[in-house]
């Protein structure tokens, strides 16, 4: 296929974290087919985030109704890549008669795609973002694209330095922080995940890190998690000065706040993956389930900026870690240049 100004539809229409993990693949797509128009179909809660991605040209919300067909039909797409195939989306792409329809070779939905890649993602043999990159590289084979550029490193979501500096100073003033000390965000919410770190262990991490330096601790949360955040604050207020961020229903607000922190500590949730896309230093806590490993759901920040801990399975309700060993590793990461 000649590489004209191709119109490419990419689909990841579910959660924030899942969408974030397609960003390296989409960057590779844009860098190798620079004249393409990339349109991204996303869920409503991801729309604001997708619109911040400079390599995505247009964003369409999956309305899940008959109007979606008309909205997509007008583009005349040459290519569609569904990073997660569902029967509804597969049928829609087939109905649109898009010449190249590519998806993972899984489930019944694969019957609607004329190009498929067998991946077996549940085996967790590589990071999710690499499975996504593999799909894009499969497209390059299909269109006979050679001389593929090496994948760019993060950040995949960007703010210019002046904006971050201004936002950081505003944040420090709003929350009365020490401007000379690093800002550490802790996000105790699990976002619906089965297990997360206990509030006691989040508290132990704060108290342990405070022994190294007088860090600024901020509890980050969504609107739904405000009470959990306040419970954490109450549990450690006597030992550590810690503040709860004002929660709002806004991805842009979350993005702006996370962009100013020096480290983000959380379970495998959407906010952790946003921090990774911003190339922040991240500390993630993962269950020991095969389909939820730290390798599979690795953040997309640079290697030297990420640290992960896997559940030692000492507690059926919470992820358990060796606090003393973990503290030393976390302190080493935050003190690195």
Where on the chain are the PLM-derived regions?
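Catalytic machinery of carbohydrate-active enzymes
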Residues: 1-337
